[in-house]
Amino acid sequence: ALAKNAAANGFAAIIAAAGGAAHLAGVIAAQTTLPVIGIPVKSGAMQGVDALYATVQMPPGIPVATVAIDGAKNAAILAAQIIGVANPEVRQKIADFKKKMADDVEKKDAKLQTLGVADYLAQKNK
């Protein structure tokens, strides 16, 4: 019922996380016209590879955008980007978030270049 009524209830996208055979995202995608983002979850002997394959290989007409195993953060960012297509405020927040991530990488790189690998890792692991 959630997937069938999601659009009417104001959803813009659905995120579905599942491990193992990971049917959840496909079942949801078959019941809605909204974008569905699948998160394969690490589990079992295959450590989520089976869930990745199950999530990414949907039949024609049942698209599921798939992120990395345990990739919930990227799933949330992708959902925000989908929402941002029609919402300039959300789009700007995503741009600000990505700028901050890039700035953080630049700061870490500068620190790494100054300290060297061994000291950087020693300081990071304190």
Where are these regions (language model features)?
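Glycine/small-residue-rich loop that forms an oxyanion/phosphate-binding "nest" at active or ligand-binding sites
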Residues: 31-56, 60
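Glycine-rich phosphate-binding loop
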Residues: 2-40
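C-terminal binding/interaction regions
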Residues: 49-126
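Hydrophobic aliphatic residue packing
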Residues: 27-28, 36-41, 62-67, 105
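Short glycine/serine/threonine-rich phosphate/pyrophosphate-binding segments
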Residues: 18-27, 46-49, 72-76
